[in-house]
Each structure stands twice: as C-alpha cells, then as structure tokens.
C-alpha cells in the first residue's frame, strides 16, 4: 500500500499530539496548542496515512537570508510510528515537504538527526541527502 501524504489540518491535532508524544516523550502537547501552531502557517506540517490512518508526520520550515539568493529549508521533525515503518511513509513525507519547500523558493534542504540514528540516516541517504561533517551547538537561554 502506498502512503498518502497531505498537509495536516486542525482535525489531525489529536493524532499529532499522540504521535509527537511517542516521538519526543515528555508531556503531551495540548490539542489547542497544536491547532494554534497549525493556524499560524509558519511551519509546514505533513501527515502520512496508511489505510486511512495517520501513521506519521514531518515538519519543515524555510528561511531567507540576505547572504544567499535562494531560501533555505529544514526538515525539523520526522516520525513514523513503529508499526508503519519500512512502508515508504518517511520517503513520501520527505518528497511531499520538498515539493512544498520548492514552491516557497527553497534551493536546499537540510535535516538534523542523531549521529547514531542509522535507520533515519539510511532513509535520508536513499532520498538523496548527503551526510556532512558539521558540529551542532546548542545553548539554553
């Protein structure tokens, strides 16, 4: 079965809350906050369906800098529930978000993932992403 990918709607808030909890742990995000985020329109949120069930999601953002001619994109989140993995959902989510980012004028897309997340790295590589040796630094404010 081929996954169906579409932009998330406010009707997906409940399943997005559940999937995000499976992915990130911590406290479940309230549906009202998810709906508010979906309504701002700043972030692309896509969902993948198999047999009419949402089984995964991915998020992307684009930004523009005077330093570069084209906008840059980033896939900021990607999760497919375990029972739906290896069925093409992640690749379909990537292709969908790449097309949406192209419409926004994005010329390059990056994805950050854990250094030892070999299944994700293999998926991204199979979709044409190239691994770079960069350091990620973070600071709490």
Give the location of each predicted region.
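Loop/helix-junction capping segments adjacent to catalytic residues or to phosphate/diphosphate-binding pockets
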Residues: 69, 87, 118
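Hydrophobic adenine-recognition pocket in adenosine-nucleotide-binding enzymes
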Residues: 8, 78-80, 113
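Residue-level recognition of the GNAT/N-acetyltransferase active site
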Residues: 63, 81, 85, 114
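Acetyl-CoA-dependent GNAT
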Residues: 3, 7-70, 76, 94-96, ...
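Conserved GNAT acetyl-CoA-binding A-motif
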Residues: 102-113
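Conserved acetyl-CoA pyrophosphate-binding loop and the N-cap/start of the following alpha-helix
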Residues: 84, 88-96
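Conserved active-site alpha-helix within GNAT-family acetyltransferase domains
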Residues: 91, 115-133, 139
